[in-house]
Amino acid sequence: MLRIDNLKLPVGAKEDKLRAACAHALRVSEEALVSVKLLRRSIDAREGVKLVCSVAVEVKNESGVWKRCKNKNVQPYAPKKYTPPAPVSAPEVSPVVIGAGPAGLFCALLLARCGARPILLERGRAVEQRKRDVEHFWRTGELDLTSNVQFGEGGAGAFSDGKLNTGTKDLRHGYILEEFVRFGASEDILVDAKPHVGTDKLYVVLQNLRREIIDRGGEVRFSHKVVDIEQNSGSVTALRVSAPEGEYTLPAKHVVLAPGHSARDTFEMLQKRGVPMEPKPFAVGVRIEHRQRDMDLAQYKEAAGRYGLPPTSYKLSCHTEKGRGVFSFCVCPGGEVVAAASEEKRVVTNGMSEFARDGENINGGLLVSVTPEDFPSGDTLAGVQFQRELEDAAYRLGGGNYAAPAQRVEDFLKHRPSTGAGKVVPTYLPSVRWCDLHGCLPPFVCEALKEGLPMLGRKLRGFDAPDAVLTAVETRSSSPVRIVRDNLSFRSALRGLYPCGEGAGYAGGIMSAAADGLRVAEMILEELNHE
């Protein structure tokens, strides 16, 4: 089999055009092609809009064709797939997974499939009820501290748009994508360069994934929050769990800690118990909204709105004179800015898109890098304190009831309050309050954004448009701490504890978190095989 990369086609090209392009690249007739399989596709809008594909081809006289075609984009291809570990005997004490985000779910899934009968503990609710709780909050401003955009089945990623981007070639990623499809996602994610599931389809995927864990002998307990870890001689022995029926003790020898980046009370408990942690860099800022059609025009130019092109996205970054990174994050085409608070009287924003991505606006995080040197103290959890201070200030500036402070870009750059929307109507609910965001963002963040916006506008026309809307504050781009673990065994210094996923500081997004969950499950299964 041969792989052809960088195969360029007109947007909207049909399968016959793909076969013809493959034959041309290989310098053979179409009749010589035995099979053609699309591996990857993307849209390149830099010089005219083109579809760029990678394709696996079976062709007659393969070795002769490869030698003769002399095309640097053609190479021999032997597809590789992830091989799950062998099954194990069910242990006397079930492994426990804390947190039902991507890391916890895929860890529990692999453990269950291999016969380990895991117990998955999630502090929030099942996605069906969680969806109702979140939508009630957006309508009314009545926040449920146990079931919100941060806590519940699926983790924070359940209310994004299910972006499955990854920059690595780990074989686990193909396995994860195939599982998403098996559980209800579109097959397009297997080939799209920027795959996304869509928040609406994620609800279905999560329910099916949960059923698989249970059908394979696992157990899933919602509204069960781990409040303490019991230990003896440096090893985990049990967990104290708060549940609707009251507290109970759960014996445990293998505990996967995948709490998510917003489990601040869990971080505090771990600190009290002496579990090694360290502060880590992250980023804070705002969500920026534009009209989708304006960004489509900037990227696709005269092709905008034609050929069935998808709503465009973007990925932008720059550095200020002082070395601060300013960059886009979690861009949601055709989406909306959402209220993502998980603590009382604190405003947090995030972005979300459904599968169709057919909303009026596109939004993305516009973030500034921060390091532990920016935090208010040298404490391990000083990053949490820093986040809370920004969220408190945003709540006050928004005027209460989880209204978010908002400002037009032109007004932000001129340091004057906004009085209303221009061409771009903000999507955040329950509501926004027009003001000056300098009242809730640290001076160094404002300075970096004011320097960065024009630079990014030069990279993408209209990004710094006067009527683009900034909504504050975005603080939960990644975890403010790293729960220290061994690089080989994935264990904490507290034996039997396996920090995992984004909340533990070892991932950044759905794909990397899910892959980390698989890695930790593999290690536990190996240990169970030797017990």
Can you name each region flagged by the protein language model?
Residues 1-531:
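Residues forming the flavin
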